[in-house]
């Protein structure tokens, strides 16, 4: 099926991916997000491509960097990264589960962030993060790569709760200040 199609497009349809980036730049985007969303080893393992994640992650960055060079050399490239594994669709994870998953997230995000930093992106963007522990692991791991980190938190409710019940204010309190935008 279409599982991980965006990761595979980085090598199978690189020109199309680059064109999408250039289209965003043409209409005034200052930042483009590399097509890294499905390029983590855990997600690619689900389709038998886990050992090829570095190739796909590099290709995603190369596509965005080429598009920037062709379309607007002053634009920024953010390496978008999804949570390394599918987060359990449950609320109230135990503290032990949160720590175990947080450690796993940290390791995978750190490795991915080092790779994309070496490629020359300007910022790392962990996207679609649903739990505070996962967000903290992602931001801390990506910061180790020496790049600025933006983070995308998914499904923030009007009452300030995150998708699985954590409170956004608790996340903000962890760093004291965090700029944010909303999507999803």
Where are the model-predicted features located?
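Domain-level signal for soluble alpha/beta catalytic cores
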Residues: 1-184
């Amino acid at each position: 099926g279409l599982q991980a199609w965006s990761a595979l497009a980085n090598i199978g349809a690189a020109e199309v991916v680059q064109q999408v980036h250039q289209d965003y730049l043409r209409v005034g985007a200052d930042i483009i997000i590399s097509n890294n969303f499905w390029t983590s080893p855990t997600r690619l393992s689900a389709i038998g491509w886990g050992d090829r994640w570095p190739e796909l992650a590099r290709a995603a960055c190369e596509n965005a960097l080429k598009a920037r060079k062709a379309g607007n050399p002053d634009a920024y490239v953010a390496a978008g990264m999804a949570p390394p594994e599918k987060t359990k669709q449950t609320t109230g994870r135990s503290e032990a589960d949160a720590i175990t998953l947080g450690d796993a997230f940290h390791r995978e995000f750190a490795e991915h962030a080092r790779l994309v930093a070496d490629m020359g992106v300007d910022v790392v963007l962990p996207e679609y993060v649903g739990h505070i522990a996962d967000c903290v692991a992602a931001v801390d791991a990506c910061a180790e790569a020496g790049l600025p980190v933006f983070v995308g938190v998914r499904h923030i409710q009007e009452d300030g709760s995150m998708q699985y019940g954590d409170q956004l204010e608790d996340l903000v309190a962890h760093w004291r200040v965090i700029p944010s935008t909303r999507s999803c």
